[in-house]
């Protein structure tokens, strides 16, 4: 079972899973099976499960849990980023909270996010390769150049920068780009990594 199945299980319109017992290994998982698998996955990959469940609006509590996990990770690695490492206690904590909140929001974006769908590919992540289409006489697609194949635009890092400058008024754009934004980017990447870990664990425990 994959994480996407968890989202479908929580959808009232999804017929894929039910509480009826399985008759063969290939039958749909029962509600009890799913909840047991989720519990095991949460015990081993709490960050990834919270990140995914919050992303898919399955739980508001999971959203906050994911941000808290991300803040813990940010604090752990902050010493590698000069613009954050030099900050004093309370200011540093607030900056990490801002970075974690915006990074998680970026991770949560999708083609379904209002205003985020790519204007060129309309959320498909694919675009027509005009040169090859003319060469081969049939439609040939390629990765969308605007969104790099994801189907949506990322949250502008400038939004996080503006929020951080409320706490560090003298933070210039160049300094942000060199010494703080790399941490912001690392937090977004970490969310995706943790989701992947949770997905693999869930698949293993629900075989």
From Swiss-Prot:
Site (Interaction with host rpoB): residue numbering on this chain: 101, 160, 165
DNA-binding region per UniProt: 171-192
Annotated site (Interaction with host RNA polymerase sigma factor RPOD): 134
GO biological process entries: DNA-templated transcription termination; transcription antitermination
UniProt-annotated stretches for the region Disordered: 1-29
Zinc finger annotations (unnamed) as residue ranges: 118-147
Residues annotated for Zn(2+) binding in this entry: 118, 121, 144, 147
Compositional bias ranges of the Polar residues kind: 20-29
A Gene Ontology molecular function term of the record: DNA binding
UniProtKB keywords: DNA-binding, Host-virus interaction, Metal-binding, Transcription, Transcription regulation, Transcription termination, Zinc, Zinc-finger
Function: Mediates the switch from middle to viral late gene expression by associating with host RNA polymerase (RNAP) so that the latter can read without pausing and through transcription terminators preceding late genes. Competes with host factor sigma 70 for binding to RPOB, the beta-subunit of host RNAP. To join the elongation complex, binds a specific DNA Q-binding element (QBE) and interacts with RNAP that is paused during early elongation. Participates in the lysis-lysogeny decision by activating the expression of the late lytic genes.
Family: Belongs to the phage antitermination Q type 2 family.
Record's subunit section: Interacts with host RPOB (via flap domain); this interaction renders host RNAP resistant to transcription pausing and allows it to read through termination signals. Interacts with host RNA polymerase sigma factor RPOD (via domain-4). Interacts with host NUSA (via N-terminus and AR2 domain); this interaction releases the autoinhibition of NUSA.
Name of protein: Antitermination protein Q
Native species: Escherichia phage HK022 (Bacteriophage HK022)
